[in-house]
Amino acid sequence: MAVSVKICGLTEAAGLAAAVDAGARYVGFVFFPKSPRHVTPGTAAELAAQVPLGVAKVGLFVNPDDAALDAVLAHVPLDVIQLHGAETPARVAEVKARTGLPVMKAVGVADPQDLDALWDYGLVADMLLIDAKPPKDAVLPGGNGLAFDWRLLAGRQILKPWLLAGGLTPENVHEAIRLTRAPGVDVSSGVESAPGVKDPDRIRSFIARATAPIL
């Protein structure tokens, strides 16, 4: 089965075009003001209009209230809501019911016990994004370029479709997929030339290596 690729934190047309043309299955827009990848609903709407059918538009939110979700959805035709904060399983279910959209929940992992949350969130979310847990003093909940021990996922059965994230780059994504057998991968900082600035060449390289056969 082909690996699905999500390019997250897109802010301009060149990066978006590179992702779409190279075969990304998901493109992500960040609605978190503290992130260097933050976009306004207006900018996201302009970019979303350039996304062809068959590529899912994902909106990343961090602990959003209903008003924050409504403000974006009034302008941007998202296909998936990504929750990347400390949202509880109950809140995940609320967001799913309120928006009528599939919800992808990020789960931060640093050690084996963190994997227990995959069960709780797997009962309510449509998809899971397994990311490196950010440091306690981190401003951003993701996109920090940090990886976790991928061997923690080896042979593990996960309830829902999932993406591997955290510290992935064109240089290591193939090995990460080999170790985890991840059905999908997510990248943001690993395909940038500077924080928030996507590098089209690195996007193309990442997707090519992520989708190369595992021997």
Swiss-Prot record:
**Cystine pairings recorded for this chain:** none
Q: Name one Pfam family in it.
A: PRAI
- Coiled-coil blocks: none
Task: List GO BP terms, alphabetically.
Answer: L-tryptophan biosynthetic process
List the GO molecular function terms.
Answer: phosphoribosylanthranilate isomerase activity
Record key words, sorted: Amino-acid biosynthesis, Aromatic amino acid biosynthesis, Isomerase, Tryptophan biosynthesis
Which catalytic reaction applies to this protein? N-(5-phospho-beta-D-ribosyl)anthranilate = 1-(2-carboxyphenylamino)-1-deoxy-D-ribulose 5-phosphate
Q: In which pathway does it act?
A: Amino-acid biosynthesis; L-tryptophan biosynthesis; L-tryptophan from chorismate: step 3/5
Keyword Isomerase assigned: yes
Q: What is its EC number?
A: 5.3.1.24
Which superkingdom does the taxonomy of this entry point to? Bacteria
Q: Which family does it belong to?
A: Belongs to the TrpF family.
Q: What is this protein called?
A: N-(5'-phosphoribosyl)anthranilate isomerase
Encoded by which gene?
Answer: trpF
